[in-house]
Each structure stands twice: as C-alpha cells, then as structure tokens.
C-alpha cells in the first residue's frame, strides 16, 4: 500500500512585530529621604522632573530639579501656601 507523507511548510518566514518590544529604563525618581530622617549636607532628598515638590529651608535645587540638603539636619515635608515643600532643620543639641 502506498502511503503519502505530506508536510506543508511556510513559504515566508514569520515577520516579527516591529511596533513592540521596546521600553525605556526606569529613572528611579521620587523620595530618597523620608520625613524625620537625619541627613548630611549634600544628600539627595527628592528626584523629580519639574517642581512637584519645592525646596524649603536649607534645601537646594539642582539643574534637573533634584532637591538636596544644604546642611546636616532632619528632613521635614510640609505644605506652604498650598504647595509641597521639603526643608532640612538643624538638630538641636540638648
């Protein structure tokens, strides 16, 4: 008896999707120090795009809007005039 072994193959290779398969690296934005935390001068407090949080007392703002401590002290997140601010207050010696 004659047996047929019929196999069908693709005549074109499967094309990969070119619109998918890419994603950007996470930028690690957000708070780097929490409220009440003791930080040293130059420590990064908050990384952001734009001014979501504004610099308060003893806090500077970098070129990319990163907030950093100017002095050693305690971090305090607070509202001033309806906007969020982060400040660093020096530790009071007892």
UniProtKB/Swiss-Prot annotation:
GO molecular function: structural constituent of ribosome
UniProt keyword annotation of Repeat present: no
Protein modification: The N-terminus is cleaved by ribosomal processing cysteine protease Prp.
Prosegment location in residue numbers: 1-9
Alphabetized UniProt keyword annotations: Ribonucleoprotein, Ribosomal protein
One CC-aspect GO term: cytosolic large ribosomal subunit
GO biological processes: translation
Region feature Disordered, mapped onto this chain: 12-33
InterPro entries with a match to the protein in the record: Ribosomal_bL27 (IPR001684), Ribosomal_bL27_CS (IPR018261)
Keyword ATP-binding applies: no
Pfam families linked: Ribosomal_L27
Family, similarity comment: Belongs to the bacterial ribosomal protein bL27 family.
NCBIfam families: L27 (TIGR00062)
Name of the protein this chain belongs to: Large ribosomal subunit protein bL27
């Amino acid at each position: 008896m004659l047996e047929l072994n019929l196999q069908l193959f693709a005549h074109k290779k499967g094309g990969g999707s070119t619109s998918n398969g890419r994603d950007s690296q996470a930028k690690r934005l957000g708070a780097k120090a929490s409220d009440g935390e003791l930080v040293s001068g130059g420590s990064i407090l908050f990384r952001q795009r734009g001014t979501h949080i504004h610099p308060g007392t003893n806090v500077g703002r970098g070129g990319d809007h990163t907030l950093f401590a100017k002095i050693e002290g305690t971090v305090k997140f607070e509202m001033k005039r309806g906007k969020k601010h982060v400040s660093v207050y020096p530790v009071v010696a007892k």
